[in-house]
Each structure stands twice: as C-alpha cells, then as structure tokens.
Amino acid sequence: MDEFEMIKRNTSEIISEEELREVLKKDEKSAYIGFEPSGKIHLGHYLQIKKMIDLQNAGFDIIILLADLHAYLNQKGELDEIRKIGDYNKKVFEAMGLKAKYVYGSEFQLDKDYTLNVYRLALKTTLKRARRSMELIAREDENPKVAEVIYPIMQVNDIHYLGVDVAVGGMEQRKIHMLARELLPKKVVCIHNPVLTGLDGEGKMSSSKGNFIAVDDSPEEIRAKIKKAYCPAGVVEGNPIMEIAKYFLEYPLTIKRPEKFGGDLTVNSYEELESLFKNKELHPMDLKNAVAEELIKILEPIRKRL
C-alpha cells in the first residue's frame, strides 16, 4: 500500500485527492487536528488518532491542537479545569503511539495579531454561514450563544496560524473546513473521517452522552458495554458494533461459537463479515463476543502505558 492509499483508507472523503498527491511530493509537510479536551478519550477520538498516525508514517509533521478556548466557548467548563484535562489527553494520545507537537489554543489565540485576523474573517462570513457550520458541533441547540459564531471563525484562523498543509477531522467538521478553503489564501487539504455511532445507536459516540467505549476501559467494562450495545440482526447501517469491526479489527478474524451454532468461524475480511451479518448467518451475540475480545487486545497496550 502506497502512502496515498494508506492515508485514504477508512476516510469518508479527501478534499481534494489531487491536492493531497501534490502535498505528498513535498519534503516538509504538516497536518493537524484539533480536539476539545475531553475527560474520556473514546473510540471516536482513537479513529482520528489512527489517521494522524497514518499521516505521521507518510512523513507528515503532526500538530495536535488542544483546543481549550474552543472547549470553553462550547461550554465544557472553566479554563483551568479544561487545561488539566488536556494534559491527560496528551498522555493518552502518546500512549496510542502518536508522535506530535502539542499546542494549546490559549498559547496563541489571545495574541493581538490572531484576534485582528479573527475580525477580518468575521467581516467575510455571514451569520447564517457561521451558525450552519456549528450544527453538528454545538453543545446547545435551543438557545444558541454568540460564542457559537466565534468558534468556527477561530477554527478557520487556527488553520491559517498553524500554516498546515492538511486539516483532519470528523465529518462534523466539514462545513468549517469548507469555510477555511474559501476564506484563506492557502487552500488546505481536508481529510474527513467517519463519525462513529454511539453504542446506543442514537447519534455519534460522545463522552457527554455516555454511549462510548473509552480507550482505558477495563476488559470487564468493554464486555459489558458491548453486550448492551445496539446491534439488531441483519442491520449494518448505524450499527456501532459493525463500525468497530470495520475500523478497528484486523482480519482474518476468528469468531468463536459453540458447535451447536456452527462452531468457530474464520472471516477473512470486513466485507465478508458484513455479508454474513447482513444475511443473518452470524448472530449478533457471536459478533459482539468476538468484537469485545479483539477490542480488549487492541486497547491493552494503551491501558498498560497509561
């Protein structure tokens, strides 16, 4: 697998693929992703970090923006508390094997020049466009705050300030990234990853909703959470267990089953697994048991490093 294919695998889209191929030719290139510091780093975060590791392996310098001011604007707590959580997040990302430069937003977002450029960008952005870009990110929908229109403009400015070639995020970041491509003099390549479905099957996996598997969960916690997770027979779309099987598990995969239910099953690819499950040749509980045990193995090195 070449560098381009390695970066492209398991992404939802790259804007644009041609521009990424040009960036890959550069001797020095950089990519960034921003995270609002979170009390629990879960599989949704891990999926993003896995992509940053792909970029790292393709020769990119990696920048992780610990977006403390963004978290503050999104009503995630007081700044001191958010900063402490960010310090913990850094340790978790390092335990995942990522080698990166870590930057707190508050280290540069309060500078005079940064603030002045936010004002310049604000003059070019309609209120409707700024609000629309926050639809999948904002914490509160019914009574939106002015902070919600400052947030995306700051994120656009972050891309400019950091001077990166590639911006990475989940699909919920797409509208902000498109705004950046329109407003900034340098068109950044945008890599968008899937947004994992929460274990309850309702919306995205989120620490605030409690519908997640944390990367430092114990084996017992992982088994219990997966056992209770939404996983209707034959349904692939919006099935969190199938998503975990697609984005985290390695193949061939052995699914252990009692002899009376057909005995152990070897699955050579995710596509084969999807076909078996869709055709109801694989029971949800057998799938859950296999996914739980494989996930425990995958997360064990991270737990040990922490």
UniProtKB/Swiss-Prot annotation:
CDD domains: TyrRS_core. It comes from the Archaea. The record marks 143 as: Interaction with t-RNA. The keyword Aminoacyl-tRNA synthetase applies. Keywords: Aminoacyl-tRNA synthetase, ATP-binding, Cytoplasm, Ligase, Nucleotide-binding, Protein biosynthesis. Its EC number is 6.1.1.1. It is an enzyme of class 6 (ligase). A motif ('KMSKS' region) lies at residues 204-208. Belongs to the class-I aminoacyl-tRNA synthetase family. TyrS type 3 subfamily. This is Tyrosine--tRNA ligase. It comes from Methanocaldococcus jannaschii (strain ATCC 43067 / DSM 2661 / JAL-1 / JCM 10045 / NBRC 100440). The gene is tyrS.
